[in-house]
């Protein structure tokens, strides 16, 4: 038999179990997004971009590396961060770029060089590698559903 007090004591555990599970769920969701955005470099298209592949280079003979993969730094810089209060941000971490940029010493990355508002280049986003992904959103929903199922 279970007493009323035993039942109340059992429910005291649930909030901490939920908080712990939510933290782990956010980590999993962040890892899923990072994995999907890094995969866009192999697929040569942004996730969920209606099947549109990145445009080819205008001069293929000039470069001897994969499209969007001169050093691999941009792909390797994709990361995520948890914020207090429930937030999760996916971003490119400029600290993961090599010390000297190959285009211009003031910028460590090709993306930063082309998207700098003070530079001579206008913003020029030609090959999107991060964005909404219905597949990852579905995975995130499943992760949260499993979390709720585990505490009920």
What are these model-derived regions, one by one?
Residues 1-152:
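Short, Lys/Arg-rich flexible segments
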């Amino acid at each position: 038999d279970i007493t009323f007090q035993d039942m109340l004591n059992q429910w005291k555990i649930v909030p901490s179990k939920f908080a712990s599970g939510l933290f782990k769920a956010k980590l999993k969701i962040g890892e899923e997004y990072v994995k999907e955005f890094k995969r866009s470099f192999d697929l040569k298209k942004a996730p969920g971009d209606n099947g549109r592949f990145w445009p080819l280079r205008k001069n293929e003979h000039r470069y001897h590396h994969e499209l969007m993969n001169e050093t691999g730094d941009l792909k390797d810089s994709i990361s995520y961060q948890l914020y207090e209060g429930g937030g999760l941000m996916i971003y490119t971490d400029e600290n993961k770029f090599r010390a000297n940029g190959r285009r211009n010493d003031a910028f460590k990355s090709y993306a930063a060089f082309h998207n700098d508002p003070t530079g001579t280049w206008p913003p020029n986003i030609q090959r999107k590698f991060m964005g909404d992904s219905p597949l990852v959103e579905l995975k995130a929903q499943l992760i949260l559903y499993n979390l709720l199922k585990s505490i009920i």
